[in-house]
């Protein structure tokens, strides 16, 4: 791998970080010079005495980044020990007779070349060992000792035992963590589980109520006047009937039920019906009197009366709308007999009861008075017609 500025900068920063050097403890060679001649040292570090440096880790990092066999040279300058870092080991410095041990003595201007292979040779175990170096001052003047200390097991058997212990501790910690997680989850899930049980019970009760309601669906809604009512044999209602809904504003239809007792506007309608019946009765008597006298009872004589009756009913004589179809007749139970309801009787016309003349129930006590009044009015109308007949004949002549 060719040296470039990016790789040069990365190696310098890694060296300063791993060896924990300050700004003044590392001298860096220019990147352009290193790119032209890779045999120059990339950097020189001034090492302190009695300080542990991770030399094996730094060599492994440089080898992985450069794809070469890096080389570190410890050199005694007389007052301190410098560490020169090379990407490639200089040929003139590398001699086959050199020897690197755990304890090395450096005199003035002497150097010690250390590679990754040398460190692996002095390791007590090939696995689980990290070698570090320490610079110590010797008893002699200007002499330093370089110690390569292997941190780890003493042999392969101890390394395997250490691995078994580490794996056992890891498995125990993992199982304990899983057990604690399950316990915490069970304790924290007690509240939601109780809530789920209550919710399921509530949903079951709601479903039961809905099924009981849907088992027998209610009959389709009908108009209040068409609903069947249980009555006794005498014709009186067995129980109080609920009042019908209020009439819509502007509606010309009025309720014709006989059991509301004027709560929905039937009283005014009953008065209007009485007036219409009286007017029609008077018109019939007048027509009979005119026919007996041999007079013409054409359209001019009965048109004002019909217009008056039509105005009372709220329907124009020139624009008559077809009557709305009545709803289906409902039946009322009268003892053991079934009869149409009061609304149907009012729509379809007067139906004769079991006994007595046809009159509304509320006018049963006023029957004789009404008959007497009608008789008096008929007599008065007849006398008026007889008195006005000579005048009409004189006008004709």
Swiss-Prot record:
The chain crosses the membrane at residues 359-381. Phosphorylated. Phosphorylation by viral kinase UL97 at Ser-216 plays an important role for correct viral nuclear egress complex (NEC) localization. Residues 382-397 are nuclear. Pfam families: Herpes_U34. It is a single-pass membrane protein. Residues 224-239, 291-301 have a biased composition (Low complexity). The modification Phosphoserine is found at residue 216. Residues 205-245, 291-332 are annotated as: Disordered. Residues 1-358 are perinuclear space. Keywords: Host membrane, Host nucleus, Late protein, Membrane, Phosphoprotein, Transmembrane, Transmembrane helix. Residues 310-322 have a biased composition (Basic residues). The keyword Transmembrane applies. One of its GO terms (cellular component) is host cell nuclear inner membrane. Its main location: host cell. It is found in: Host nucleus inner membrane. Plays an essential role in virion nuclear egress, the first step of virion release from infected cell. Within the host nucleus, NEC1 interacts with the newly formed capsid through the vertexes and directs it to the inner nuclear membrane by associating with NEC2. Induces the budding of the capsid at the inner nuclear membrane as well as its envelopment into the perinuclear space. HAMAP family: HSV_NEC2. Belongs to the herpesviridae NEC2 protein family. Forms a heterohexameric complex with NEC1. Interacts with host UBA7 and RNF170; this interaction promotes UBA7 proteasomal degradation. This is Nuclear egress protein 2. The gene is NEC2.
């Amino acid at each position: 791998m060719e040296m470039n500025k990016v790789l040069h900068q990365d190696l310098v920063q890694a060296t300063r970080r791993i060896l924990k050097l300050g700004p003044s403890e590392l001298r860096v060679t220019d990147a352009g010079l290193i790119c032209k001649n890779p045999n120059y040292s990339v950097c020189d570090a001034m090492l302190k005495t009695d300080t542990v440096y991770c030399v094996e880790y730094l060599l492994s990092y440089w080898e992985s980044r450069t794809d070469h066999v890096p080389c570190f040279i410890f050199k005694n300058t007389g007052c301190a020990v410098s560490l020169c870092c090379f990407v490639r080991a200089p040929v003139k410095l590398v001699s086959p007779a050199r020897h690197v041990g755990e304890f090395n003595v450096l005199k003035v201007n002497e150097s010690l070349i250390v590679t990754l292979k040398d460190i692996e040779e002095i390791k007590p175990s090939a696995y689980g060992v990290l070698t570090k170096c320490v610079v110590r001052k010797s008893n002699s003047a200007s002499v330093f000792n370089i110690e390569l200390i292997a941190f780890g097991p003493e042999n392969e058997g101890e390394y395997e035992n250490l691995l078994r212990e580490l794996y056992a501790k890891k498995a125990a910690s993992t199982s304990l963590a899983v057990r604690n997680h399950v316990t915490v989850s069970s304790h924290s899930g007690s509240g939601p589980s109780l809530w789920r049980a209550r919710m399921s019970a509530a949903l079951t009760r709601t479903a039961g109520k809905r099924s009981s309601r849907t088992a027998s669906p209610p009959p389709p809604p009908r108009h209040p006047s068409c609903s069947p009512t249980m009555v006794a044999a005498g014709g009186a209602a067995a129980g109080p009937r609920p009042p019908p809904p209020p009439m819509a504003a502007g509606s010309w239809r009025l309720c014709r039920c006989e059991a509301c007792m004027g709560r929905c506007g039937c009283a005014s309608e009953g008065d209007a019906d009485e007036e219409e019946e009286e007017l029609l009765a008077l018109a019939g008597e007048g027509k009979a009197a005119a026919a007996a006298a041999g007079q013409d009872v054409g359209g001019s004589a009965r048109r004002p009366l019909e217009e008056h009756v039509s105005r009372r009913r709220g329907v124009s004589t020139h624009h008559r709308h077809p009557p709305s179809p009545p709803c289906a007749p409902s039946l009322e139970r009268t003892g053991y007999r079934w009869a149409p309801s009061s609304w149907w009787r009012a729509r379809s016309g007067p139906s004769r009861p079991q006994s007595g003349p046809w009159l509304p129930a509320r006018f049963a006590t006023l029957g004789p008075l009404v008959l007497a009044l009608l008789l008096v009015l008929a007599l008065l109308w007849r006398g008026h017609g007889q008195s006005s007949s000579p005048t009409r004949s004189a006008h004709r002549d």
